[in-house]
Amino acid sequence: MKVTVLGAAGGIGQTLSLLLKLRLPAGADLALYDISPVTPGIAVDISHIPTSVNAIGYAGEDPSVALKDPSVALKDTNLVIITAGIARKPGMTRADLFNINAGIVKDLVEKVAEVCPMACIGIVTNPVNTLVPIAAEVLRKAGVYDKSKLFGVTTLDVVRAKTFVSELKHKNVETVTVPVVGGHSGTTILPLLSQALAEGRLLDFSQTEIESLTQRIKNAGTEVVEAKAGGGSATLSMAESGARFALAVFKALLGEDCVRYAYVQSKEGSGYPEFFAHPVRFGLKGIEEILPIAPLNEYEQTQFEELKPILEADIELGKKFVNP
């Protein structure tokens, strides 16, 4: 079994690669690819860590690899994690990333369609709302689209909600669960605090707490960008969240039961936008089942109605990028 990280030399990619080297099951293969010439060195660096995961790196500028061609890294892979692209800077929204990152992800997914069409694809690169539909259209054009094998990684939203709720309510963070659905941008993330649990029991929030927590979860990415004063975005927490997700899906492909939130194609006629973050059961072939979202309260329903047209516009933007 093999995982390939595309964008492995970036701020998220390096840390993600390290975490996968530490956490993947013994005997797993880990391929790292980036256009940066340092990528093989990153693989050498983490290969010195004593785990039974085999890491090898490929660079787009490596003479043994066709220029900017990740084909060798993708050969026989089971799971592709895409982190390639530019990161957010102060004043930038995820939408500002679109013009650059859309082209990068489109090119990479075209290679996935060609080299490993049966692989599962997890997209970390922002804007996830738009890049996942781009990937879907690219795979459709290639005749290999399988909605059970494509997902946007929204784990960071769930991780942040869990952390912020545990801090506010002084609960053991390991016992806290908070559903987070919707999209993966400040205007489309929807935490369902009415369903938040600690130690298996529903938590009580005042309306002020709900509104404050909701806004903090939605804008947590901006909080990090501003706190780093121009020195980067949420690379470390994103890498850790991406590693959690990748590891869970990898184990599901090996037969372990796994439920995670992910931005995936919704069931037709469900009333949700075409792509939406749902609770998902993963299995041997990728997505096995999209699980139902419990009824929303009035505040959450209002939020849902507000985000729906924004998310639908994001999705349409992605589709038109591939099919003008």
From Swiss-Prot:
Its EC number is 1.1.1.37. NAD(+) binds at G7, A8, A9, G10, G11, I12, G13, D34, N101, V124, T125, N126, M238. Pfam families: Ldh_1_C (PF02866), Ldh_1_N (PF00056). PROSITE patterns: MDH (PS00068). Keywords: NAD, Oxidoreductase, Tricarboxylic acid cycle. The active site is at H184 (proton acceptor). One of its GO terms (biological process) is tricarboxylic acid cycle. It catalyses: (S)-malate + NAD(+) = oxaloacetate + NADH + H(+). InterPro entries: L-lactate/malate_DH (IPR001557), Lactate/malate_DH_C (IPR022383), Lactate/malate_DH_N (IPR001236), Lactate_DH/Glyco_Ohase_4_C (IPR015955), Malate_DH_AS (IPR001252), Malate_DH_type1 (IPR010097), Malate_DH_type1_bac (IPR023958), NAD(P)-bd_dom_sf (IPR036291). One of its GO terms (cellular component) is cytoplasm. Substrate binds at R88, R94, N126, R160. GO terms for molecular function: L-malate dehydrogenase (NAD+) activity. Catalyzes the reversible oxidation of malate to oxaloacetate. HAMAP family: Malate_dehydrog_1 (MF_01516). Belongs to the LDH/MDH superfamily. MDH type 1 family. PANTHER family: MALATE AND LACTATE DEHYDROGENASE, MALATE DEHYDROGENASE, MITOCHONDRIAL. Homodimer. This is Malate dehydrogenase.
